[in-house]
């Protein structure tokens, strides 16, 4: 039998994995996997588990949200020739699952995909020095939604928690002067949102069209949302973001391998839905397909 390392975040998604956990384990066993469980107890546990033990297994998988998957990938980036990654998404919004078409909050269905799926090359983002992101690094409007929403509210309200928190932020959108240097050019101006991503979705609010994103092409999508300048124009800008109208004058989508952001003051970032700290300057890059994701 193949050896499967399964890292479980017991607090993700209101603990919903418990309801069909036995059936999911049977699905994996019937598919030829002998599973060893690792339960996280705090931040970065998944990273350390993956770094320390993944090389001993044929496949590494995790049960949790995008943050758990991000931690696992961060650990695998520290070892040579990492095994392929399976994902049982049990988070609140599950942006990665939305991008790759995995069943969400369905332990049996996702376990079946680990058995029947194919490993696909998956780009990983570099976040400053020695830190990584699986699918997005972002700042500005809406980016605080994921890590600013209280955990108890996430568990109790699910996706609605993000919508409520996002609605609160509409009244306090801040314009941020920034210089952005990327592969083919430079942007200088005021932004209300910026990101570098390998995903079609962030917090279920900002979305890119499926045909714009390829997960293993060595390119990331740089999204820059400019300050409209007037109160009346904010409605047009918000509509462009929410309806994915990328021909809007306020919205730029640029493919790049590298981006450097320079602000006039420290600015808060989110890294895969978690607090990424504040940075006055930050360099992001695309690592071309260092891991493989099963779907």
Model-predicted regions and their roles:
Residues 31, 40, 78-196:
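Catalytic core of DAGKc-family lipid kinases
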Residues 1-63:
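ATP/NTP phosphate-donor binding region
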């Amino acid at each position: 039998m193949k050896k499967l390392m399964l890292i479980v975040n017991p607090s993700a998604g209101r603990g919903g994995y418990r309801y069909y956990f036995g059936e999911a384990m049977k699905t994996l066993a019937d598919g030829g996997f002998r599973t060893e469980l690792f339960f996280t107890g705090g931040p970065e546990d998944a990273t350390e588990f993956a770094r320390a033990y993944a090389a001993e297994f044929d496949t590494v998988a995790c049960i949790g949200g995008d943050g758990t998957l991000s931690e696992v990938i961060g650990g695998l980036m520290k070892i040579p020739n990492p095994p392929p990654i399976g994902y049982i998404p049990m988070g609140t919004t599950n942006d990665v699952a939305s991008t790759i078409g995995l069943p969400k909050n369905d332990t049996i269905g996702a376990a079946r995909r680990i058995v029947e799926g194919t490993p696909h090359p998956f780009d990983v983002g570099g976040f400053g020095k020695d830190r990584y992101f699986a699918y997005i690094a972002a700042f500005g409007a809406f980016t605080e939604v994921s890590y600013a929403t209280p955990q108890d509210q996430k568990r109790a309200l699910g996706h609605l928690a993000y919508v409520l928190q996002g609605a609160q932020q509409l009244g306090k959108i801040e314009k941020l002067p920034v210089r952005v240097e990327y592969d083919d050019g430079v942007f200088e101006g005021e932004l209300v949102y910026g990101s570098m991503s390998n995903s079609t979705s962030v917090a279920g609010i900002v979305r890119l069209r499926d045909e714009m994103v390829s997960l293993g092409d060595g390119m990331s999508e740089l999204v820059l949302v400019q300050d409209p300048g007037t109160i009346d124009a904010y409605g047009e800008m918000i509509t462009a973001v929410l309806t994915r109208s990328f021909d809007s004058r306020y919205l730029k989508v640029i493919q790049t391998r590298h981006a450097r952001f320079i602000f006039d003051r420290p600015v808060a970032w989110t890294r895969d839905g978690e607090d990424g700290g504040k940075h006055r300057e930050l360099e992001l890059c695309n690592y071309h397909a260092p891991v493989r994701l099963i779907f």
